[in-house]
Structures are given as structure tokens and as C-alpha cells.
Amino acid sequence: VLTDRQELGIKGEWIAERWLKLRGWAILDRRFRDGHRDLDLVACKIEAGKSDRLVAFVEVRTRFSTDFGTPAETVGWKKQRELARSARKWISSNRRSGDTYRFDVVGVIVGGGSVQIQYVPDAFWLRQFG
């Protein structure tokens, strides 16, 4: 049985996935598990005329409002470190020559019968990424 918070998170991930697909992203992985950590979405995009992939590790934050800050502001340094560890694990199994990587945050705000998306590409950088 899922809690209300878990159901909200799953709904937000579904909304974020659809939003990304409509903007030309392909989803490579959903809820990639690395022990107790996970990556919500792993998405890729290939720009016209190029063969290299841009791979984004997407953290989805779903909220009812921004009263306590934007969704991106809720991804603190501890969460960033966890995401980096999971990303390294994903890369070790899925690396392709020419891939570039980044961390994005998709904020999904649901409330009042509407949905608002806040997309933050390159939301944060990590020095020792590979």
C-alpha cells in the first residue's frame, strides 16, 4: 500500500516523463535503483545532425505549492551526492562513447486543478563525475 506522498511522487514522475517526451527526450530508465537510492528518470536527447547523446539524470520533485521553496531548491547537497553515486552506477553499466551527462530537476506543482512544470537543466554540477 502506497502512502499519499508516494502516490503523489509517482504521479509527478509520470507527468514529468510525458513532459520530457513531448520535448524530444527519450526515457532510458525509470526509478533506477542503486541500493536504497534511486534515479527518478534517466533521459536522453540527440540533437539534429549529431550522433552523441546528452544523458540527463532527472530528479522529479512534486509539490502542492511553492510555499516552502521551489522544487529545485529542495535538492540539497546530500541528495545531490546520492544522485551522483547512483549516476556513476548507471554510467558504469550503460556508458556509450560520446555521451555527455548532466543533472536536471523537474518540479511538478499540482494544485487547484492545474499542473505547473518548473524545469531546471544543469541544476547542479559535480566535480568528480566520471
Predicted segments with their positions:
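Short acidic/glycine-enriched loop/turn segments that link adjacent beta-strands
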Residues: 34-38, 113
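Acidic-basic catalytic patches of nuclease active cores, encompassing PD-(D/E)XK
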Residues: 1-30
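Conserved catalytic cores of phosphodiester-cleaving nucleases, focusing on short active-site segments
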Residues: 20, 39-47, 51-71, 75, ...
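Mid-chain, well-packed structural core segment of small domains
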Residues: 68-101
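Domain-level recognition of nuclease-like catalytic cores that cleave nucleotide substrates
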Residues: 93-130
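Anionic group-transfer/hydrolysis microenvironments
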Residues: 31, 40-42, 61-63, 106-109, ...
